[in-house]
Amino acid sequence: MKDVTIIGGGPSGLYASFYAGLRDMSVRLIDVQSELGGKMRIYPEKIIWDIGGIAPKPCHEILKDTIKQGLYFKPEVHLNERVVDIRKKAERHFEVETEAGEIYTSKAVIIAIGAGIINPKQLDVKGVERYQLTNLHYVVQSYRRFKDKDVLISGGGNTALDWAHDIAKIAKSVTVVYRKEDVSGHEAMKTLVTDLNVKLCPKTRIKYLVGNDDETHISEVVLEHVESGDRHTVKFDDVIISHGFDRCNTLLSETSSKLDMHDDCRVKGFGNTTTSIPGIYACGDIVYHDAKSHLIASAFSDGANAANLAKTYIQPDANAEGYVSSHHEVFKEANKTIVNKHLY
């Protein structure tokens, strides 16, 4: 039996893992995705400005450090496992069950599932799956691949406009198609992309994808006006889909441990990351409490808070908070290495 099972490997879950390790707890970390990082993996190239003391840098750089920190105390990690139930058997005895039927036991549970299981909405066009490993994209991993390319973006929200704005600086051309009369993203961003000569095509959708000779890459796209039905075919090197996300939060609605909810999709926190069930804590975007800010920075704070509460639940005579890291014995040898690196 582990001290704590953390469900969710995004920034809050990773920091909870680190801080629980710092508090000398054994940790199990479970995530439904094939990689740790949560929603941060959706926008790896976006520049993050709002983490205190961290200079603005691409999200993938922050994520790399966050994962490294989260794994510092060597938690037991399970990827590609979907949690379907949390059962409280007794005080300091929880069972976490996965879709595959695995049952993991721990003394406390931290829920850090963000907005739930998030997957980009797929383009509903025949044969689309054959291009998903080549030049059809739902996530932009690197802007560099679009250098000097003709790029089509489908979607009119903020993410689509952000990608159009950034890619237009290096691409040969960028075209944005969207079904409505106007984009739904910020008006200021619409002005910016227009200034960069991004072509905006309202009331237009992707009707067909035309492949190359061996059907491995998209070579042309048939676009259709949603009202008139007029169609025209355009050559593109890459196609990016930004149609929002499908979200699944069935864990909270179907679990045996019925938590008080703030709304249909967030756990009610009682002043912090405490939930209505002793021994279960929630951190990050999945929890609502009065001091909540939906920032990566506050996800870290939530993670530490949840770990501290789990510690005192498991061991009531433990200190409510851990020692500051600069004075913590566990980092003594690691600190010597870091100091020597900077001195010499």
From Swiss-Prot:
EC number: 1.18.1.2
Entries under SUPFAM superfamilies matching the protein: FAD/NAD(P)-binding domain
Cofactor stoichiometry and binding remark: Binds 1 FAD per subunit.
GO BP annotation list: cell redox homeostasis
Cofactor: FAD
A GO molecular-function annotation: thioredoxin-disulfide reductase (NADPH) activity
Alphabetized InterPro entries for the sequence: FAD/NAD-bd_sf, FAD/NAD-binding_dom, Fd--NADP_Rdtase_type_2, Ferredoxin-NADP_redctase_2
Keywords carried by this UniProt record: FAD, Flavoprotein, NADP, Oxidoreductase
Binding locations of FAD: S12, D31, K39, Y43, V83, I118, D285, S326
Enzyme superclass (EC): oxidoreductase
Catalytically driven reaction(s): 2 reduced [2Fe-2S]-[ferredoxin] + NADP(+) + H(+) = 2 oxidized [2Fe-2S]-[ferredoxin] + NADPH
Domain of life: Bacteria
The protein's assembly and partners: Homodimer.
Family in the record: Belongs to the ferredoxin--NADP reductase type 2 family.
Protein name (Swiss-Prot/TrEMBL): Ferredoxin--NADP reductase
Organism, as annotated: Staphylococcus aureus (strain NCTC 8325 / PS 47)
Lineage of origin: Bacteria, Bacillati, Bacillota, Bacilli, Bacillales
